[in-house]
């Protein structure tokens, strides 16, 4: 299956469900309390993240799509914190505020990467009138490409069947992340996304893939669903439809640090891809790839278009790391969040040879990621003469990107990459040859930002000019 990213900017997705605030208190612990046999945590870091349906909405916004969120909150500090955090990532919040209930909040205390305790602040909203939510759904649906109902059994979806009918009447696909063993309440939905445990609570234990397909397909028919997407942890996902062959997607996770919120990412990416015009099978492929990315992060997390692009194509087929400048800056920002050191070099690289390969490998060893900035065809011609380049820019970038040492390749139009380097500000700027560091384009900007500038040797006797001259003699 050839899969490409859709234009997420054109997608409009409405999320309705149980919103909550995830709070994390971090700190060291070095002693036991004299008051009780419990560790004393000296809190030095506090984080607040949207959880539940709010995390789904944030996942949608992180793709660049238009995300609107409807849910129930209290009138309290937690509701303000949740709204502020979501507005900063371009989620449009349309909350129903209930004075008699607190905003659902989950507080986790952690030390040395170990969760010591979780405190839940909630009363549930099952006794709250659904009419204000109905009104918000009806008002939003005409402009939406998909509706997500995110059920955490906290009360926002107590009347879920009426919400499904509103979406069907408007012709909007409705995707549901279910909760509990009563799937009958989701009858008529477009698609459900249970995990394996939730699925087996409803249909019984499945000992084989064939049994899973048989029971899942029957469930699709019994509940008048269009499809069922079962998330199966390390075994990936299975898409089941009444009159289609099953689609099994293997997991794409390389390392698993935390599965918190992975289901939110799956349904968020799935619905957004559908709203952007992707067919169901491709949308599931994208959701599976996104899940593989997000479980490699700690806590509830999101996935960016760049991360998703790299995930669906893999290191060997992702355009070989070829990026526009704006994409590169986003990728560098993400790498820095992971604590990675960025190395950058530049050149024409007209005919890639052993000297280039050795030089780039040595440059890569200086840090964690290597950017290669490449002169455009016009820039190369001005620098090298009318007969150059021998290979056009696209081919030069493709060959460079195929090297294991190279993470990202970007083009520049100017005679030097000074402006580009000043924009990216690598941790280490590298140039090959006999340059003085102060003469290297971009060195002043890198030094001013606290970075390093290094000069590496090229291998003697190997150059593009020598190769061209040797070819001409033959």
From Swiss-Prot:
Gene label: hldE
Record organism: Proteus mirabilis (strain HI4320)
Region annotation (Ribokinase) ranges: 1-318
Segments of this protein annotated with the region Cytidylyltransferase: 344-474
Organism taxonomic ancestry: Bacteria, Pseudomonadati, Pseudomonadota, Gammaproteobacteria, Enterobacterales
Residues where ATP binds: 195-198
NCBIfam families, sorted: cyt_tran_rel, PRK11316.1, rfaE_dom_I, rfaE_dom_II
Subunit structure: Homodimer.
Protein name per its UniProtKB record: Bifunctional protein HldE
Gene Ontology MF annotations: ATP binding; heptose 7-phosphate kinase activity; heptose-1-phosphate adenylyltransferase activity; phosphotransferase activity, alcohol group as acceptor
């Amino acid at each position: 299956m050839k899969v490409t990213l859709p234009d997420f900017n054109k997608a409009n997705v409405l999320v309705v469900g149980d919103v909550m605030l995830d709070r994390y208190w971090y700190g060291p612990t070095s002693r036991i309390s004299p008051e009780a046999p419990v560790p004393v945590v000296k809190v030095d870091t506090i984080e607040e993240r949207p959880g539940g349906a709010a995390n789904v909405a944030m996942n949608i916004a992180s793709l660049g799509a238009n995300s609107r969120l409807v849910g129930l909150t209290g009138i309290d500090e937690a509701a303000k914190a949740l709204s502020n955090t979501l507005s900063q990532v371009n989620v449009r919040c349309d909350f129903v505020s209930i004075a008699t209930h607190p905003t659902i909040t989950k507080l986790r205390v952690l030390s040395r990467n170990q969760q010591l305790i979780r405190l839940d602040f909630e009363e549930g909203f099952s006794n709250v009138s659904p009419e204000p939510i109905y009104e918000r759904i009806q008002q939003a649906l005409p402009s939406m490409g998909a509706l997500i109902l995110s059920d955490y059994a906290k009360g926002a979806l107590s009347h879920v069947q009426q919400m499904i009918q509103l979406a069907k009447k408007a012709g909007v696909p409705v995707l549901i992340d279910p909760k509990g063993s009563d799937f009958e309440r989701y009858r008529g939905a477009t698609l459900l996304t249970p995990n394996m445990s939730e699925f087996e609570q409803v249909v019984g234990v499945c000992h084989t893939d064939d049994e899973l397909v048989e029971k899942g397909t029957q469930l699709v028919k019994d509940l008048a669903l269009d499809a069922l997407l079962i998330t199966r942890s390390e075994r990936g996902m299975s898409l089941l439809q009444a009159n289609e062959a099953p689609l099994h997607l293997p997991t794409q996770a390389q390392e698993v640090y935390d599965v918190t919120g992975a289901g939110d990412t799956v349904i968020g990416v799935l619905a957004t891809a559908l709203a952007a015009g992707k067919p169901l099978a491709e949308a599931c492929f994208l959701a599976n790839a996104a899940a593989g990315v997000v479980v490699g992060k700690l806590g509830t997390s999101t996935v960016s278009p760049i991360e998703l692009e790299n995930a669906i194509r893999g290191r060997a087929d992702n355009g070989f790391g070829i990026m526009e400048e704006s994409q590169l800056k986003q990728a560098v920002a993400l790498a820095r969040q992971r604590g990675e050191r960025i190395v950058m070099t530049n050149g024409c690289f007209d005919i890639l040879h052993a000297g280039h390969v050795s030089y780039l490998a040595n440059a890569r060893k200086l840090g964690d990621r290597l950017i290669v900035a490449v002169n455009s065809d016009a820039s190369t011609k001005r620098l090298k003469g009318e007969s150059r380049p021998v290979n056009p820019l696209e081919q030069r970038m493709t060959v460079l990107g195929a090297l294991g040492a190279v993470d990202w390749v970007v083009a520049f139009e100017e005679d030097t990459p000074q402006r580009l380097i000043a924009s990216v500000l690598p941790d280490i700027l590298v140039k090959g040859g006999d340059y003085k560091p102060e003469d290297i384009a971009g060195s002043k900007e890198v030094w001013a930002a606290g970075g390093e500038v290094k000069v590496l040797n090229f291998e003697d006797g190997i150059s593009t000019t020598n190769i061209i001259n040797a070819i001409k003699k033959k």
